[in-house]
Each structure stands twice: as structure tokens, then as C-alpha cells.
């Protein structure tokens, strides 16, 4: 339905200015200007129509690269997330060394961030043995790649803040899954999920619970030495636990 709406907007934009004008008479500057006008008016389908015409008619214009970036944002604002991600990925493939790749990585991370449902809601609706929520994980990886490649990007601070939020949510998810395995007496599975959280999401406050899960699992397996070692790591990292650990 959203794709149909976007198509209607695009057709309306073409009709408003004349299809022949867009195809033949408008130069790159005017095409881009008209696209920006459509964008500012909230007509994202019309904006895409102008930007795509600019790309098709003037592929080597300096404005074409900016138009390609604007198409990503227009799709995003129109609610066409898959199209926005595809446009961002295409830009990265065609322009791997372009200085604005930081923007495409940021937009991909933002789109996945917006798509990620509340993890606690998912925990009560899906099998607890399911893998971590894909959209949250993808968003985390996109922001991670952005910070690795473009540490001085204007989007770096926002990406970092979102990563902290995602890191904590994903670590919490892993703990919920590990608790599930602990209740099922699948102690090796519980240890592996807790270890995964510790290795993948360093710095998350939820890792205190991850260590507690490992201690409990080791004890139930009769591995008292490993339980004691993990207890020392817990105390060194977080001090004495403030609450008694429970698997419920």
C-alpha cells in the first residue's frame, strides 16, 4: 500500500510540472531544486521522481550523488524502509570511498533502529531460544561500522548513543535467553548465551547478571572451581552483588 501511495505522489509530481519538461528541458540544477522543493513540502514521492530523473539524465553531474543521498532520506520519510536501505547499499557499492558513506551507514542504522520492536515485548511473544532480534542487531552493526570507519563523522555522537541503548537491550535479551536455558536445566546453553553477551556487548550493565547466570550454571554442573573463578570476576568488575540472584 505504501508503494502505491509513493507512486501516486510521483505521478502527481510529474503531472504538475509536465512529463516532457522533466525529461527534456530541465537542467540538473533545476531538477535538484524542484526535488528539494518537493521534499520540503513533504511530497517525498515527487522528490524521488525529480531526483531519479536527475540521476538518469545527468549521471555524471556533481548534483547526482547528492540526489542519490536525498533519495535515501525521501524513501525513509515516506515509510519505505526497504527501498531506503536498498538505495543506501547501492550508493555504498557504487561509491565505496565517497566521503558521505558515513551518511548511508547512519541511515541504515537508523532505519533498523526504528524497525526494531521492543525486545521485552518480543520475549513474551516468541520462543526464548530464538536468536537476538535481527533489526536491533543490524542497527548495532551499522553504527559500529560507522564509528570504526568515520570516527569524526557528524553522525558519530548520535550513533554512539544509539549503540549504547542497543547494546544494553541486546545484552538483556541474551540474559533472558540464558535464564530460559537455566530453568530448563540446559546449563551449557545458559553459559554459552551469557558468555556471548559478555564477549559481544562489553560495558553493558546487564553483564553483572550474565556473570551471575554463569556462576549458577557452573555450580549446578558441579564445576565449583569455574564458579569460584567467575565469582571473582563478578566481584572485581561489579563489587558484591546487591541482590540475591534468582533464575525466575
Residue spans for each PLM region:
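Sec-dependent bacterial lipoprotein signal peptides
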Residues: 1-17
Amino acid at each position: 500500500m505504501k508503494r502505491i501511495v509513493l507512486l501516486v505522489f510521483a505521478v502527481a509530481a510529474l503531472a504538475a510540472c509536465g512529463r516532457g519538461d522533466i525529461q527534456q528541458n530541465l537542467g540538473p540544477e533545476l531538477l535538484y531544486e524542484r526535488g528539494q522543493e518537493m521534499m520540503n513540502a513533504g511530497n517525498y514521492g515527487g522528490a524521488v521522481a525529480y531526483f531519479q530523473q536527475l540521476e538518469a539524465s545527468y549521471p555524471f553531474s556533481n548534483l547526482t550523488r547528492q540526489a542519490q543521498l536525498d533519495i535515501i532520506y525521501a524513501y525513509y520519510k515516506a515509510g519505505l524502509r526497504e527501498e531506503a536501505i536498498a538505495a543506501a547499499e547501492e550508493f555504498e557499492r557504487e561509491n565505496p570511498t565517497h566521503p558521505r558513506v558515513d551518511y548511508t551507514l547512519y541511515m541504515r542504522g537508523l532505519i533498523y533502529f526504528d524497525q526494531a520492536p521492543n525486545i521485552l515485548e518480543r520475549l513474551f511473544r516468541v520462543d526464548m531460544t530464538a536468536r537476538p532480534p535481527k533489526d536491533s542487531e543490524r542497527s548495532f552493526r551499522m553504527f559500529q561500522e560507522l564509528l570504526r570507519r568515520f570516527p569524526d563523522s557528524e553522525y558519530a555522537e548520535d550513533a554512539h548513543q544509539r549503540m549504547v541503548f542497543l547494546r544494553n537491550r541486546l545484552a538483556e535479551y541474551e540474559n533472558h535467553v540464558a535464564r530460559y536455558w537455566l530453568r530448563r536445566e540446559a546449563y551449557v546453553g545458559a553459559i554459552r548465551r551469557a558468555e556471548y553477551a559478555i564477549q559481544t556487548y562489553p560495558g553493558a550493565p546487564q553483564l553483572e547478571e550474565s556473570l551471575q547466570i554463569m556462576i549458577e550454571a557452573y555450580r549446578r554442573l558441579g564445576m565449583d572451581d569455574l564458579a569460584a573463578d567467575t565469582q571473582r570476576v563478578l566481584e572485581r568488575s561489579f563489587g558484591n552483588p546487591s541482590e540475591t540472584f534468582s533464575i525466575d
